[in-house]
């Protein structure tokens, strides 16, 4: 597979995990110190807009102009771009605090589809959940009246979320299972689910619907045979492996890769990049033929043109 090069844009913080394109072409990202940044379309000017007080991950636009933040520690937040005011929209589900709010997609009617990755581990122990394969992730929806409903449970590291262009389905990445699950919202299959993609070559992270109508998926790391062997083992082995110190756990292989699928699950784009200066793609956003990428571990975002 050909390896392409990315244009890397530094930000004043580490772990710019997701990327968002604003209505005027500005690029939004957020880092592990809680900062939410807005970049000019050319990436030359970076402005800190707000601080969440937690660990922001997925970013989306709300219909009222605010920026939705999936904060792994605090839940669903809304940021007013002009003032930087932060409002907590949802921090609990069924009376219990969310442990690992991760990614979201916003419907035209204001519903917010989002993931809670694990009932056992937080963002700070994400590798433990992946290794143990707790299968406690959920796909949730926040209705406009503020109520929250569980659409899917038992997901293996629930991660990225994307809506169909016609909002007939919502897709969710199961990082541990290397699949993209499609939950039907309308039509004769409403309420059921199937797969948009299976047996991916790596572990899917954040997803988004591009301006090209495709579902873009960040592939954080290639398939790891050691991780797969541990996950296939008995519960005691998985739990013991999850309790190993971070330095002793399997580490993501250094790579930078994104894929794009049509509504039939066909691969339209599969791009791998030189990972020397930017690796571990965890967020991806296409707009007008340019694709921006975020990373859980890099002090930067990056882009390429299709």
Question: Which role does the model predict for each range below?
Answer:
Residues 1-306:
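Sequence-structural signature of mature extracellular/luminal beta-sheet repeat domains
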């Amino acid at each position: 597979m050909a390896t392409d090069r990315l244009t890397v844009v530094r930000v004043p913080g580490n772990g710019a995990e997701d990327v968002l394109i604003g209505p005027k072409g500005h690029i939004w990202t957020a880092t592990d110190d809680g900062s939410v940044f807005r970049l000019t379309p050319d990436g030359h000017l970076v402005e800190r807009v707000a601080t969440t007080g937690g660990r922001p991950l997925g970013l989306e636009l709300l219909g009222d102009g605010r920026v939705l933040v999936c904060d792994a520690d605090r839940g669903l937040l809304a940021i007013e771009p002009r003032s930087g005011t932060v409002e907590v929209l949802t921090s609990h589900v069924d009376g219990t605090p969310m442990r690992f709010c991760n990614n979201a997609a916003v419907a035209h009617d204001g519903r917010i589809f989002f993931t809670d990755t694990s009932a056992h581990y937080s963002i700070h122990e994400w590798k433990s959940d992946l290794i143990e394969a707790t299968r406690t992730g959920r796909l949730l929806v926040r209705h406009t009246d503020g109520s929250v409903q569980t659409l899917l449970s038992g997901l293996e590291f629930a991660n990225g979320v994307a809506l169909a262009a016609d909002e007939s389905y919502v897709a969710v990445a199961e990082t541990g299972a290397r699949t993209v699950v499609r939950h039907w919202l309308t039509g004769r299959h409403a309420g059921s689910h199937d797969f948009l993609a299976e047996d991916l070559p790596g572990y899917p992270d954040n997803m988004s619907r591009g301006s090209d109508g495709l579902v873009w998926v960040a592939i954080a790391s290639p398939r790891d045979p050691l991780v797969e062997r541990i996950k296939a083992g008995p519960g005691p082995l998985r739990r013991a492996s999850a309790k190993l110190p971070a330095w002793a756990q399997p580490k993501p292989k250094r790579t930078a890769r994104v894929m794009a699928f049509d509504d039939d699950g066909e691969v339209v784009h599969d791009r791998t990049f030189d990972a020397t200066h930017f690796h571990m793609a965890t967020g991806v956003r296409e707009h007008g033929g340019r694709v921006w990428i975020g990373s859980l571990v890099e002090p930067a975002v990056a882009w390429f043109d299709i």
